[in-house]
């Protein structure tokens, strides 16, 4: 039983997956998308869902600082609906405010990553943080 965490942007989707017990999240990759052309990376997600035997999705919900839902959060919700329709799997959302900012800070301070390197990994790290925050809040997937 694994969860897939997604950080959905307008040009990329960061992807992370949990371990089978739901303790930790690992960043997998970044999928290029194009919202304007309605290219959402579903073919690649299908491969990953099958490969990792994913049972549910967790998407970051980028709320505004005043807790309201803005255009970017609405796009994330629409992406979640697309996933439900396509995969027939549950989709949950978690507040992701400042996740990308925190991921960037980590890359600079802890990994001393260049701006170019940050762009290559930041969405994957943000997806990992989104999923890890969700796992930490919900507890392990296999309760005894």
Curated annotation (Swiss-Prot):
Q: Give GO terms: molecular function aspect only.
A: nuclease activity
Q: Any idea which UniProt keywords this protein has?
A: Cytoplasm, Hydrolase, Nuclease, Ribosome biogenesis
Where located? Cytoplasm
Question: What is the recorded function of this protein according to its Swiss-Prot or TrEMBL entry?
Answer: Could be a nuclease involved in processing of the 5'-end of pre-16S rRNA.
Q: Does the keyword Repeat apply?
A: no
Q: State the Pfam families in the record.
A: RuvX
State the SMART domains in the record: YqgFc
Q: Which domain of life is it from?
A: Bacteria
The similarity comment for this entry is:
Belongs to the YqgF nuclease family.
Q: Which InterPro entries match?
A: RNaseH-like_sf, YqgF, YqgF/RNaseH-like_dom, YqgF/RNaseH-like_dom_sf
GO CC, sorted alphabetically, is: cytosol
Q: What is its EC number?
A: 3.1.-.-
| A GO BP annotation | rRNA 5'-end processing
Tell me the protein's name. Putative pre-16S rRNA nuclease
């Amino acid at each position: 039983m694994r969860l897939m965490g997604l950080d959905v942007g307008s040009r990329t989707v960061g992807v992370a997956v949990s371990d089978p017990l739901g303790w930790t999240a690992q960043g997998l990759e970044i999928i290029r998308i194009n919202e304007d052309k309605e290219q959402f990376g579903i073919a690649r997600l299908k491969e990953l869902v099958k490969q990792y035997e994913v049972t549910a999705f967790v998407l970051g919900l980028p709320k505004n600082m005043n807790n309201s839902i803005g255009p970017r959060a609405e796009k994330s919700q629409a992406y979640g609906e697309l996933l439900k329709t396509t995969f027939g799997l549950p989709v949950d959302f978690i507040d992701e405010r400042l996740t990308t900012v925190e991921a960037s800070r980590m890359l600079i301070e802890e990994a001393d990553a260049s701006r170019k390197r940050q762009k290559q990994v930041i969405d994957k790290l943000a997806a990992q943080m989104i999923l890890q925050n969700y796992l930490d809040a919900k507890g392990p997937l296999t309760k005894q």
